[in-house]
């Protein structure tokens, strides 16, 4: 660590914010927080010579593990109880191109790699079978529904597979050419949200949302389509949609370049689909309008991965952004590479590993800190080196070029401190 004191330490001090300060001969002063880090980082080592640190997908299983797709490196897993990484879990060469999505049941993992789905036995950690969608196209997402059927999205439409007599068989295929009322808005589909309570699937795409409503037998009754409309104020910000999560009756949807969308469906008596939407992005404090992964926490607030990691306060309707100095694995987070566990911890994968954390009720935590003056300059020269002990300053005419320096003397996440000031009897 280039910022740490190396040797010949001559003084140690613990300040009011639990920062430990260490001074050393000819080595300056170093400080570090002694508090537990809010963001915990797990670094990923490449699983092969051509491997990558990049986490391409994440999936939490009720067995207490987060299963992780490692680009060019198969599947690894993280024990959420012991907070330990187990690598490798399954690094069969068939998984090496790129794991795009993972699902699981009590006995198996289902892992999509390009154009195939591989079935891994949990106990032996070996691939026991595989199958391919009829379209033989690149797979973007797979999801198990209430009936333990596997839905697959590609750029050639939507397919559904069911296990029969030990074999996974195609039972449904839907495209933009399927007759109504089961026609999709487009063949180019991205991520699937399975709403088990309402027995329906909501799928993001390059042409808005497709909402599949199922009956009690699991048959698709209709597909409702929702698209952006530039003529209305409460519209989706874009039709090019990716990550999706839900809280109560509200869907939170990430876009590539058009921010975060809040979507509520309206079920009209005549069956016509409608919705209301609001969108948020850079104007509300986001670091970017690319929202590549979305997770709603236990308090109803939304965490977004993309360019760094952002927290969206749904009450204030503002973003708070976090970066490397907050302990993140890097500046880049993967597309839909996130999940949440049974305890409410959130996991976000990126270019060098992943971060996990337990959201709090209020983030960031507000605190009133006293500002201390530290230096005063007049025409570029230090005039009063002991300004912190001075109650008043007199600036004689015509000196009108001066600078005042101040600090809170708090080193607890100083990168997130914000200051406000006003001139009395001048500023309103």
Question: Locations of the language-model features?
Answer:
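Carboxylate-rich, polar loop motifs that coordinate divalent cations or form catalytic acidic clusters
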Residues: 1-428
């Amino acid at each position: 660590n280039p910022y740490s004191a190396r040797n010949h330490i001559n003084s140690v001090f613990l300040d009011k914010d639990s920062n430990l300060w260490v001074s050393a001969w000819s080595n300056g002063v170093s400080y570090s927080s002694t508090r537990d880090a809010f963001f915990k980082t797990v670094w990923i080592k490449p699983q092969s010579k051509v491997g990558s640190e990049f986490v391409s997908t994440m999936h939490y299983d009720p067995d207490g593990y987060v299963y992780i797709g490692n680009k060019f490196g198969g599947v690894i897993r993280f024990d959420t109880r012991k907070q330990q990484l187990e690598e490798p879990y399954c690094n069969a060469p068939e998984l090496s191109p790129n794991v795009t999505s993972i699902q699981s049941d009590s006995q198996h993992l289902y892992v999509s790699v390009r154009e195939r789905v591989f079935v891994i036995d949990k106990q032996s950690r070996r691939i026991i079978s595989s199958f391919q969608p009829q379209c033989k196209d690149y797979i973007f997402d797979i999801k198990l529904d209430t009936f333990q059927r596997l839905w697959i999205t590609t750029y050639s439409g939507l397919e559904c597979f069911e296990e029969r007599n030990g074999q996974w068989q195609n039972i449904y295929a839907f495209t933009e050419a399927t007759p109504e009322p089961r026609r999709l808005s487009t063949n180019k589909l991205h991520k699937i949200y399975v709403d088990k309570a309402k027995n329906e699937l909501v799928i993001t795409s390059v042409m808005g949302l497709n909402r599949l409503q199922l009956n009690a037998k699991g048959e698709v009754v209709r597909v409702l389509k929702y698209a952006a409309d530039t003529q209305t104020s409460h519209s989706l910000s874009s039709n090019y949609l990716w990550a999706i999560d839900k809280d109560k009756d509200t869907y939170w949807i990430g876009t590539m370049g058009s921010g975060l969308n809040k979507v509520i469906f309206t079920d009209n008596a005549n069956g016509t689909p409608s919705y209301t939407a609001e969108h948020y992005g850079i104007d509300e404090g986001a670091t970017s309008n690319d929202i590549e992964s979305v997770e709603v926490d236990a308090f109803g607030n939304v965490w977004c991965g993309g360019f760094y990691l952002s927290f969206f306060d749904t009450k204030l309707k503002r973003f708070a952004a976090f970066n490397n100095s907050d302990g993140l694995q890097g500046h880049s987070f993967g597309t839909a590479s996130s999940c949440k566990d049974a305890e409410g911890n959130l996991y976000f994968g990126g270019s060098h590993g992943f971060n996990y954390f337990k959201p709090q009720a209020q983030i960031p935590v507000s605190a009133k800190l006293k500002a201390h003056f530290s230096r005063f300059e007049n025409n570029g020269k230090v005039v009063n080196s002991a300004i912190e002990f001075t109650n008043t300053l007199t600036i004689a005419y015509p000196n009108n070029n001066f600078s005042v320096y101040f600090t809170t003397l708090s080193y607890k996440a100083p990168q997130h401190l914000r200051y406000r000031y006003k001139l009395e009897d001048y500023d309103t």
